[in-house]
Amino acid sequence: MKEKKIMALADENIMNTYRRVPIALVKGEGARLWDANGKEYLDFVAGIAVCNLGHSHPNVVKAIKKQAKNLMHVSNLYYTRPQGEVASILTKHSFADKVFFCNSGAEANEAAIKLARKYAHENLGEDKFELITMKDSFHGRTMATITATGQEKFQFGFTPLLDGFKYVPFNDPAALEDAITPKTCGIMLEPIQGEGGVIIPDDRYLAKVRDICDRHRILMIVDEV
């Protein structure tokens, strides 16, 4: 199919939620992409940081083929060997004791927000429901995650936002401490801000956030890809 026809088909049938670059990609190998006209590109986007192994990696293709021959999706109502094996690898190589599998960063953040409020309800009291997030942050495009996002440009057109969120400057432990109230249940932040313009905090900032959370018995939510 020619490039113009590919783009026309998409424009006619897919909701216009992205400002697309006018090229139609048809093939990838490693860090390289080709469009429908045969033009080659270097892929620095990596599916917005989710395809870091590149395109058509032989080991990835082999694993997908193997799994497709055995089982497709069966839901979390049942046990499967690969799910447990991957979870075990993740827990052994991270701080985590448990893993929650989901489909997107926004879904992960939604779950984290729910977990923070659930934790507070069961351990601190039902009046503790507020989350503190950072100005110039980005946490997703669902209702809860655009509310958590500290940028008005992502919230425009979707008000009223959800209750229970407040924003403080990134890399400012004093402002964070001042923002905590008897209703606070957690602090949510990116270790390095991306959408706000690659902002790296001071070396001790995250340790100070951890200390603040521990002292107030609230959860620290780290949004990292």
Q: Across the structure, where does each feature detected by a protein language model lie?
A:
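Glycine-rich loop-to-alpha-helix module at the N-terminal edge of alpha/beta enzyme cores
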Residues: 40-126
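Hydrophobic "anchor" residues on beta-strands that sit immediately upstream
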Residues: 39, 186, 219-220
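Active-site-adjacent loop/helix segments that line or gate small-molecule/cofactor pockets in enzymes
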Residues: 1-29
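PLP-dependent aspartate aminotransferase-fold enzymes
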Residues: 87-186
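Catalytic PLP-binding core of fold-type I/II PLP enzymes
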Residues: 181, 199-225
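Structural signal for hydrophobic packing residues in well-ordered secondary-structure cores
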Residues: 10, 14, 18, 68, ...
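Short acidic, glycine-rich surface-loop motifs adjacent to enzyme active sites
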Residues: 184-198
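Active-site and channel-lining beta-strand-loop segments
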Residues: 23-43
